[in-house]
Regions:
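N-terminal assembly/interaction segments in proteins that build large macromolecular machines
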Residues: 1-168
Length: 168
């Protein structure tokens, strides 16, 4: 169980985090939800390359502590094991980022787009795209991640269907 949330800063930078709990009861707890938001706010400001570096950063809400210290403190307050499972930060250099969180924090999506124009219409289109991504649960985030084996397999399926589809 747990939650994910996204924080977007100045339409250029976004971070998504997932924080796990043992039960859905805790995931609905306001203290836990505020902590997840604080972790996302930390992530959007972070330059950490990985989770270990992120956990050792000074906690923005109390620089005398690390992110790890803040997590341990929340575990003591909430009384249940918690884990910051993952985070991802996206920075748009030539465009913008938008986000969408579905199901009260079950799925989080960030879309980065290169565009010369950033206005409400562009943001609305990108938000609609983010909603579709959440609904479709894609296997890959970018073209670069798709293996040649997968592409070949999909091409075989399409080629096999092609003669049948020509008659329709």
């Amino acid at each position: 169980e747990g939650l994910c949330t996204v924080v977007v800063k100045d339409d250029k930078t976004a971070a998504v985090v997932e924080v796990n709990s043992e039960t859905d009861f805790v995931a609905k707890n306001e203290t836990f939800q505020q902590f997840v938001k604080a972790v996302a706010e930390q992530a959007v400001e972070s330059d950490a390359a990985d989770m270990d570096a992120f956990m050792e950063e000074k906690w923005n809400e109390d620089p005398s502590k690390t992110v790890k210290d803040a997590l341990v403190e929340k575990v003591a307050v909430i009384g249940e094991n918690l884990k910051i499972r993952r985070f991802e930060k996206v920075v748009a250099t030539n465009g913008c980022v938008v986000s969408y969180v579905h199901g009260g924090g079950r799925i989080g999506v960030i879309v980065e787009a290169e565009t010369a124009v950033v206005n409400d219409a562009v943001k609305e289109a990108l938000t609609n795209l983010a909603m579709q991504i959440a609904a479709l649960n894609p296997k890959y985030v970018s073209r670069d991640e798709i293996s040649e084996e997968y592409i070949s397999h999909e091409k075989e399926i399409l080629l096999a269907q092609s003669p049948r589809n020509q008659r329709k």
